[in-house]
Amino acid sequence: MVQAINLKKGMIFSQDGKLIKVLKANHHKPGKGNTVMQMDLRDVKSGAVVHKTMRPTEKVDLVEVTKKSAQYLYNEGDNYTFMDTDTYDQYEVSADQLGDDIKFLMPNIVVDMDFTDDNKIIGIELPSTVEMTVKETQPGIKGATVAGGGKPATMETGLVVQVPDFINEGEKLVIGTENGDYKSRANSQPR
């Protein structure tokens, strides 16, 4: 048993006979009243996402999860195929199980796959960032800075990201998988 205040993104717990995956977990302190945990949760089986508020002291049963490294290969319709990087076994995961993570799946990306004790796939955990190419955006503005208002850019997977005004089509960018936000140009050296 673990208290709700200790729940973090990616954790899986059991509630009312269902496996629930934490998509987001935020501490919230309203002006009046006690602190609450506001969470986005996904039913592992159905893929349904709900927003739930819990008291920090509420307890839930964590589910033991086995992680295996796997490489994304391809998709056919709503089924996505991954290959275990150690055993070369292939696994299919439904679009419902993946949810919004689909927008970050690039060919050959390596993810962690989550399995229950009875070897059922629960879902995947993405790396913290991915590199993607800008497929469509307005032309870049010369002399623009990162501090500008930004503009929307459609990435090669269909993900829409707010990027600085100086970004052009065809550029490779580093995108955070937590919020889908622009981090930097790929291959740029930190200053």
Swiss-Prot record:
GO terms for biological process: peptide biosynthetic process. Its main location: cytoplasm. It comes from the Bacteria. Pathway: Protein biosynthesis; polypeptide chain elongation. GO terms for cellular component: cytoplasm. Keywords: Cytoplasm, Elongation factor, Protein biosynthesis. It is found in: Cytoplasm. InterPro entries: Elong-fact-P_C, NA-bd_OB-fold, Rib_uL2_dom2, Transl_elong_fac_P/YeiP, Transl_elong_KOW-like, Transl_elong_P/YeiP_cen, Transl_elong_P/YeiP_CS, Transl_elongation_fac_P. Involved in peptide bond synthesis. Stimulates efficient translation and peptide-bond synthesis on native or reconstituted 70S ribosomes in vitro. Probably functions indirectly by altering the affinity of the ribosome for aminoacyl-tRNA, thus increasing their reactivity as acceptors for peptidyl transferase. Belongs to the elongation factor P family. This is Elongation factor P 1. It comes from Lactobacillus acidophilus (strain ATCC 700396 / NCK56 / N2 / NCFM).
